[in-house]
Amino acid sequence: MKTSDFDYNLPQEYIAQKPAEPRDSSRLLVLNRQSEELTNRIFGEITDYFKPGDVLVMNDSRVLPARIKGIKQDTSAKIEILLLKRDGEGCWEALLKPSKRTKPGTIIDIHQPNGGISTQAKVLADKDDSIKLLRFSDETHLMKLGEVPLPPYIHTPVADPERYQTVYALTNGSVAAPTAGLHFTPELLKRLTEMGVICTYVTLHIGLDTFRPVKEEDPKDHKIHREYGILSKETASAICCAKETGKRVFCVGTSATRLVEQASHLSQTSLITSYSGWADLFILPGYKFRVADCFITNFHLPRSTPLMLTSAFAGWPFLRKAYEKAISEHYRFYSFGDAMLIL
């Protein structure tokens, strides 16, 4: 297995710049692993594939307004801050753009455009991979000073920032959306609940590494990024109950899948128990899934860890066939793109 095995060519015009409207009008490519059939559907028709008692696991992490514009106090130069994760009281790991000549001790002034609330950030230290450690003088209004960051391949402004949030987003912490969940509407979730589907939630805060290609020739040499997650006792109980009664667990997105598999991998007493901590499980082809029976996901970047996880679930030859079909039939790719359901 080589990283180059997970490469494919995608014309730029296939990268969706705007979300489908309404959310559940996006296309859905259904992959049946048993029959190796590929079926074109609309996402709102996904209810056809559920049965009463099935469990739907979704990631309720909310994207932070993590992109903040500031002015360097010493030079008056403009600078952009991208918050990555909190590191203690008032402290955050962040990427700065531009980052050159921004040494420890640099003060950055941050103001609302209308002259309202403000704060200062002090660069405390350099960390790995161009990451800086910042301390903010006042953290209370920090979330009001920024805007939601969009992926680097989306070049069109989004009229409504909430379209880059799931309708069930609850807990601030991600810098990228759990995009497989963007297709669900409140009405669709209501229909699933009325069918007897058990809708449950986990929280996994997604970092920027989700967009980064694996550079090592052998993916096993890649150091997977860590993301903080929480899986409640109630969600673990729902999953165990489904497994014990012959029902299926549908995981929405690579983030939810990764967390439930991590929790199951670490569980000492049963299939899965409640969990809170870092998720660093790297799922590659050959991995035996313990929790996920069915998988809802978007179309992923070449050489990315989400693509490798999806390949582990579907099998790369079958998944490649699905990607070739999606490209030939003009499916929309990446964060605002269409989805697939793998059965």
From Swiss-Prot:
InterPro entries, alphabetized:
QueA, QueA_dom1, QueA_dom2, QueA_sf
Enzyme Commission number(s) from the entry? 2.4.99.17
Protein name from the UniProt record: S-adenosylmethionine:tRNA ribosyltransferase-isomerase
GO annotation, biological process: queuosine biosynthetic process; tRNA wobble guanine modification
Under which main EC class is this enzyme filed?
transferase
Keywords assigned by UniProt? Answer: Cytoplasm, Queuosine biosynthesis, S-adenosyl-L-methionine, Transferase
What the protein does comes down to:
Transfers and isomerizes the ribose moiety from AdoMet to the 7-aminomethyl group of 7-deazaguanine (preQ1-tRNA) to give epoxyqueuosine (oQ-tRNA).
**Subunit structure, per the record?**
Monomer.
Which pathway does it operate in? tRNA modification; tRNA-queuosine biosynthesis
Q: Any idea where this protein resides?
A: Cytoplasm
* Example of a GO cellular component annotation carried by this entry: cytoplasm
Keyword Cytoplasm listed? The answer is yes
What is catalyzed by this enzyme? 7-aminomethyl-7-carbaguanosine(34) in tRNA + S-adenosyl-L-methionine = epoxyqueuosine(34) in tRNA + adenine + L-methionine + 2 H(+)
Q: Which GO molecular-function terms appear in the entry?
A: S-adenosylmethionine:tRNA ribosyltransferase-isomerase activity
Family indicated by similarity:
Belongs to the QueA family.
